[in-house]
Amino acid sequence: MNLSEYSRRPSGEVRIGRVVIGGGHPVAVQSMTNTDTNDTEACAAQIERIDRAGGGIVRLTAQGRREGENLANIVRRVREDGFDTAIVADIHFVPEVAAIAAKYVDKVRINPGNYRTDHGELEALIAQCRERGVALRIGVNHGSLSKRVFDRWGDTPQGMVVSAMEFLRVCKAQGFDQVVVSMKSSNTRVMVAAYRLLVEAMDAEDMHYPIHLGVTEAGNGIEGRIKSAVGIGALMADGIGDTIRVSLTEAPENEIPVAELLVKHFARRPGKFPVLHPERYSPTEYRRRTNVAVPVVHTEPQEGFCVIEAVSENPTAELRAAILNLDTPRPVVVKRRYGETSPETLAVKAAADLGVLFLDGLADGIWIDAPGFAEEEIRNIELMILQAARVRFSHTEYIACPSCGRTLYDIEKTLAAVKSRTSHLKNLKIGVMGCIVNGPGEMADADYGYVGAAPGRITLYKGRTVVERNIPQEEALDRLVELIRDNGDWVEP
């Protein structure tokens, strides 16, 4: 990591169908279907919409043998329609399904947390991928580490890295380099730390696999875009990332413009900003520079604060260097002027530029100077950036998955309904998850959870504890509100 100037991390080339990532190629954007993988027409239509929007890589879940075999029909239909989209299978739990999927798709994603390896399954999959020219993604999820790793390391960034490196070492020993790796979490601080630790671990073992970036369960609307931009932007500012997915609880094609905006935003970052005291900074250890309890926004009193404004095309490096070079313990407000006219563009760019300074404990206040926007609109964006960076909580936080073919209900409508009933509960975190694969783990720090258990059935959580199982979906929202009331966390709107 170069603290003084922007440079992309060197990585090897990996071919995913027609798309090549790593090796200095442009950062690729991608998405994932949320249709039933057994529904060939619906999946093909959604893949084609994503491709037309600019997403050249599309992933589908294959949770069983039937879904794995139907990938052949989906790929065939997409090709017949004239699309050469790179198609990826997402596998959990069943190595046999990975072997089926590898016969048809361009890349297979497996999760070390739930992929069996005791009988040479990984080596067999590598051999199959090599023979067919199929790429492999080692995709670690914070919410689904194996029991063995969890018992030793807990659900920590270090545990995520241990999980990934075990699989990457097998790939290296097999001489297989068509590998991509990811370290996803809904917690931006965990996610950024995990990726940075992974890069350190790979560098130490001379590994140069391309990296797939993403924040899981970011939610929807402007909040979801800001949360993704804070996490992904923090790493892209470090030069990390060869392909990205902005996970939103919306139509998958809505993710593509946000991802493309981030790629374009980091495409050119000139300027060199020497850091005189690099010992004051650790990319993998969170520590606050000051003891300011609650970071401020620009409309709040800033007596005794030092305001530092970025004026270059590389605001993150400029501000970081200026803060690290300060010879005063005064708290710092970071300021940046934007000429944007779109609220979404302003929010994404500001989150990508400034969020990392709070993730790293360097900044104590945020000031977005945007003449085209009302003060209240700017203030709301600033507060959402601080919340996404996990330094100040000012509104209800929703940990909501983007949904996929495993999702057991209409998650977009459900999230909207949950928000309409609970958005006034400012100090709560509420998880709304499509299924049990990553749901309970990814929402582990949520106060309450709403998780799909079976078609038309919902399980409710208080923290990590199941409170009610298999509730009829039509009753689940009222029961969630009752659960919040029963635990003393409800206030009248």
Predicted regions and their residues:
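N-terminal small/glycine-rich loop or linker at the start of catalytic domains
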Residues: 11-35, 71-72, 137-152
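Active-site mouth loops of central-metabolism enzymes
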Residues: 24-42, 61, 85-93, 113, ...
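Conserved, mostly hydrophobic/aromatic
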Residues: 29, 90, 138, 181, ...
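Glycine-rich, proline-tolerant flexible connector loops at the mouths of alpha/beta enzymes
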Residues: 34, 52-78, 112-117, 179-188, ...
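Alpha-helix-loop-beta-strand connector modules within alpha/beta enzyme cores
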Residues: 65-89, 125-134, 198-207, 268, ...
